[in-house]
């Protein structure tokens, strides 16, 4: 019985510490990036290196590929079967990334969320495009 209680307490202690290992920081990128409906490309330089970029659809549906992940040079996301956002970065320990945004022909605004991270630290960047 004592072993069970000790195991349970150890597990609770471990789980409670996980959140302390990951913290939100500012890598020097803007919190929100807005593109006109015509699209375009832009380079963003940060003030610290990062190891990966995760791309999320903030409002995924059953038909969406709501998550794309990459340690590689390019990572992209499909949104409603229309590839509109491409992220390019130099891989592990880079300090910049480039966004390619296709023209918006849907007539509606659209958005994605990027998480720039370095294992224990992350920054969230919202990418929006006018409709």
Regions inferred by a protein language model and the residue ranges of each:
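Short, hydrophobic beta-strand segments
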Residues: 95-105
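Bacterial Sec-dependent N-terminal signal peptides
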Residues: 1-2, 13-36
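Structural beta-strand segments of beta-rich domains
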Residues: 31, 40-44, 97
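Sec-dependent signal peptide recognition
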Residues: 2-8
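Hydrophobic loop/turn residues within beta-sheet-rich immunoglobulin-like superfamily modules
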Residues: 38, 47-49, 102-104
């Amino acid at each position: 019985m004592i072993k069970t209680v000790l195991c349970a307490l150890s597990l609770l202690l471990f789980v409670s510490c996980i959140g302390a290992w990951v913290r939100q920081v500012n890598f020097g990128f803007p919190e929100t990036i807005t593109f006109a409906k015509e699209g375009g490309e832009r380079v963003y330089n940060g003030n610290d290196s990062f190891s990966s970029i995760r791309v999320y659809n903030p409002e995924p549906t059953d038909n969406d590929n709501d998550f794309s992940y990459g340690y590689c040079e390019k990572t992209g996301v499909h949104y409603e079967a229309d590839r509109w956002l491409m992220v390019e970065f130099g891989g592990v320990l880079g300090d910049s990334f480039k966004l390619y945004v296709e023209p918006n022909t849907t007539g509606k605004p659209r958005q994605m969320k990027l998480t720039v991270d370095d294992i224990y630290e992350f920054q969230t960047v919202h990418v929006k495009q006018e409709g």
